[in-house]
Amino acid sequence: MIITAWSALSPYGTEDQAFAEGTTARRPLPHKPRPVPDFEPREYLGRQGTRTMGRATALSIAAATRLLTEDMDPTRTGLVLGTTNGSAQSILEVNRASRERKSPHHVQPSSIQNATMNSIAGQTAIWHGLQGPNATLAGGTTTGLLALGYCRRLLLTGRADVLLAGAVEELSEARTWVRSGTAPLAEGCALVRLETDATGGLAEVLAVTSLVVTDGDTKTAVRRAAERVLDRVSPGQVWATMGSGTGEDAESTALTTVCPQATRLPPVTEAVGQLHSAAGAFQLVTALTRAAVSGPGDRVVLLTSVEHQGIVAAAVVRIKGENVVA
């Protein structure tokens, strides 16, 4: 499975280059909620069809726009998108309206579509005319890596030729109520384009896996997941490891045990902020940008992610030694 392009709208800016430069230089961001700057959906996407569009949907549509080309067959192109619960703000507003208005059914119909979990993926596909598989995943911080595994199965079974995979989170009042950790809340959308028959490409996903922690031993679970995906490369071939940061010392210790000589890339939460379900997708594109400036030659990166409810995911990616700014 080949990564042929990527796109990211982040607190560093609306352009991919801004994200690449910000993460590689580790440019500091304000220690407060971090929106995507200068992103107004109606100005960015146009006024038609955006009056009632949710912010997360607009971010997803904007990111997908950069990854689609005219020669792609829309019937064979799909989208696998991660989210925590869709637009938390829209869910809150619909529930509030159903309680505060004269009757529970006196809710603005146009607001309901943004309050369903799979609305963002569906609206993105409709906007771009994609007719391939369309799926929404919700696996917490592991969602981005889980999406890679989901796409791998779709591609291997011939369900699609091209898939966009990633995750999106919007910054809203409602989301501040589910804040976790100490990093400032952040929003954004990160997507990669995945193909099987592409020549060249930016990177190859060698393996991806996930498992459930049933005994509370996160360290052992991370180690097992990492060892499982390292079946095509040896630990000594791994250039860098990158954890999610949510597993704290257990995750870091496990990565050191499995790949003691590898470079440690800091968790995406340290640079970008708390992205919740979008963390894994941003973790992947961060690894792509960091490898691109590390010098010539391919780089193998081991990614792991830990969701506090008991999910662990891991992936191994071989990144080609070339500029990977899409």
Q: Each PLM stretch: what is its role?
A:
Residues Y150:
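Internal active-site segments that recognize and position negatively charged phosphoryl groups
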Residues L137-A138:
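Membrane-interface segments at transmembrane-helix boundaries
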Residues M1-P133, L145, R153-L156, V168-A326:
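Conserved "HGTGT" condensation-loop signature of ketosynthase/thiolase-family condensing enzymes
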